Amino acid sequence: VQQIARTVAAVLVAAMAGAVSTAYAQSDGIVDELKLGVLDHGVTFFEHSVETGVDLNGELLFHRLFEPLDVLGMSIIFRPNLGVSVATNGTTSIGYGGLSMDIMLVRNVFRDGDGFFLDGAFDLVVHDGCLNNCPSDRKALGSRLLGRRAGEIGYQIDPQWSVSAMIDHIGNYGLATPNAGLKTAGIRIGYKF
């Protein structure tokens, strides 16, 4: 099963590379944005972290599903996403896909084209981590298929480049036992095509 999860992750990375090269060659392609980041694996706030290390994260955000919503002067868009987080120390790596909600809080703060944003995502996850009866340095995630929630706050430097801080949580949300869950947090750079 771990080999299947690693194969799925490799296919996702290859698909991302292909989509990025296609999007770069054609500005009207299906890919809207690429985000790359470095994440702290196994973030905890009040307890000892079981899994630790550094994850490399890549995410494709596709063009919006419909016209932006304007709520209280903030622009809200919904975009499908597809991503991977690879644990560099051999612990739990994930592949995910779902829906991102992007909220542009304020535009043209310091210059034309910049602004501050909030993003949230809800995704399905496939992982290569431990399920049950795990060694002491691994999280027991209970199910091969998990859910993912992510939050991000960032600065749109110009119409193409952004920098952001992101945190996410994967877990089975009580649909299987055990349900240890896993958090990562870090910094990402975004590039819009």
Which residues fall in each region the model found?
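Residue-level signature of outer-membrane beta-barrel architecture
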Residues: 60-64, 86, 101-103, 107, ...
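Sequence/structural signature of outer-membrane beta-barrel proteins
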Residues: 41-45, 65-67, 83-89, 106-108, ...
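Outer-membrane beta-barrel translocator/channel fold
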Residues: 118-150, 154
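Membrane-embedded beta-strand positions of outer-membrane beta-barrel proteins
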Residues: 34-38, 58, 80-84, 118-122, ...
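Cleavable N-terminal export/targeting peptides
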Residues: 1-29
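Outer-membrane beta-barrel "beta-signal"
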Residues: 54-58, 181-193
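Repeated loop/turn-to-beta-strand initiation elements of outer-membrane beta-barrel proteins
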Residues: 34, 65-70, 107-109, 116, ...
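Solvent-exposed loop/turn segments connecting transmembrane beta-strands
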Residues: 44-52, 84-95, 112, 174-182
